[in-house]
């Protein structure tokens, strides 16, 4: 009798353990971040982790792809071998989306891309592929609006009084959809508002503050240094690097970024940065987790959420931030 009771207890424990393991596996989501030390992706990673805790019952297998697509490809293979029920992928190279989809598709695993848009063709190639991100055109237009607003309100910004903005532009990663589109539309929006522009320098800072500082330092050491009136940056990380360079040269120039990083907001409050565009990491993080969790459980991607899908894409809106509305965003 005693032996039977012991065996029953062991069997119950094994069954309970199996059920717990099964539950964990059912909610196991593999995540790859293109590189952990990117300013904005560091925020995104924290928001994803925070939302997973709020939702509950999720085990995140988080990976740093170290800005190498080959590493990310290997990470996806390992995640699939560990039995993840969904993938959340921040691509290193958007052109690699078909490779990731091929891996996920062979195991019938849903994949939610985020931050780097794989493009409609890639999403359309697999019925369980989704994208959470923004409309980069919107960020360029809003940044252009911010610059135009301050340019028109402050005639002193026109250093040579020619009615034209002489600008330099720090571009993100070449080929990255956000970098290409922000660069195009910020200038188009300025021109559409009747402001003439003249590009003095443009170069990639690869989203990186240190690289951006070096670029701006070179520009401020050139023969055109005194002609620069505005510094435009595809993200706040590079804007912070630009600010360091201007300080080193004893110059104060209007600098505009994108992301609304906490440190950028503080610098706007001090008058050291002119403006930024909120890239909403909180809502993007929530959408990534909520879609991935639903898909991992075999549910509709947006079931029980506020997100709207169009062609299996969720777009989170941008918001312009300057000294006039800064109080709405400072925590």
Swiss-Prot record:
Keywords: Calcium, Metal-binding, Periplasm, Signal, Sugar transport, Transport. One of its GO terms (molecular function) is carbohydrate binding. The keyword Acetylation does not apply. Beta-D-galactose binds at residues 38, 115, 176, 178, 182, 235, 259, 279. Ca(2+) binds at residues 158, 160, 162, 164, 166, 229. It holds the Pfam family Peripla_BP_4. It is found in: Periplasm. Beta-D-glucose binds at residues 38, 115, 176, 178, 182, 235, 259, 279. Transmembrane segments: none annotated. The calcium-binding site is structurally similar to that of EF-hand proteins, but is in two parts, with the last calcium ligand provided by Glu-229. Part of the ABC transporter complex MglABC involved in galactose/methyl galactoside import. This is D-galactose/methyl-galactoside binding periplasmic protein MglB. It comes from Haemophilus influenzae (strain ATCC 51907 / DSM 11121 / KW20 / Rd). The lineage of its organism: Bacteria, Pseudomonadati, Pseudomonadota, Gammaproteobacteria, Pasteurellales. The gene is mglB.
């Amino acid at each position: 009798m005693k032996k039977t009771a012991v065996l029953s207890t062991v069997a119950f424990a094994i069954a309970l353990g199996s059920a717990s393991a099964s539950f964990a596996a059912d909610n196991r989501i593999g995540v790859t971040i293109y590189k952990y030390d990117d300013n904005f992706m560091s925020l995104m990673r924290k928001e994803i982790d925070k939302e997973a805790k709020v939702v509950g019952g999720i085990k995140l297998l988080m990976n740093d792809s170290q800005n190498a697509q080959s590493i990310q490809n290997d990470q996806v293979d390992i995640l699939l071998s560990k039995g993840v029920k969904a993938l959340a992928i921040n691509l290193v190279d958007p052109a690699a989306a078909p490779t990731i989809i091929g891996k996920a598709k062979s195991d019938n695993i849903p994949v939610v891309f985020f931050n780097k848009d794989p493009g409609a063709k890639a999403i359309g190639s697999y019925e369980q592929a989704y994208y959470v991100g923004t409309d980069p055109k919107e960020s360029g237009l809003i940044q252009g609006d911010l610059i135009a607003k301050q340019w028109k309100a402050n005639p002193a910004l026109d250093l040579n009084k020619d009615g034209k903005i002489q600008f330099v532009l720090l571009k993100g990663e070449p080929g990255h959809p956000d970098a290409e589109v922000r660069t195009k539309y910020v200038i188009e929006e300025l021109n559409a508002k009747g402001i003439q522009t003249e590009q003095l320098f443009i170069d990639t800072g690869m989203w990186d503050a240190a690289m951006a500082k070096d670029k701006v330092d070179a520009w401020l050491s050139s023969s055109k240094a005194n002609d620069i009136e505005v510094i435009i940056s595809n993200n706040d990380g590079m804007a912070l690097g630009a600010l360091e360079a201007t300080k080193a040269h004893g110059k104060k120039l209007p600098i505009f970024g994108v992301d609304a990083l906490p440190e950028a907001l503080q610098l706007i409050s001090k008058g050291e940065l002119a403006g930024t565009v909120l890239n909403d990491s909180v809502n993007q993080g929530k959408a990534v987790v909520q879609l991935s969790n639903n898909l991992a459980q075999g549910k509709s991607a947006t079931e029980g959420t506020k997100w709207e899908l169009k062609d299996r894409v969720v777009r989170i809106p941008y918001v312009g931030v300057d000294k006039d509305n800064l109080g709405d965003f400072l925590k």
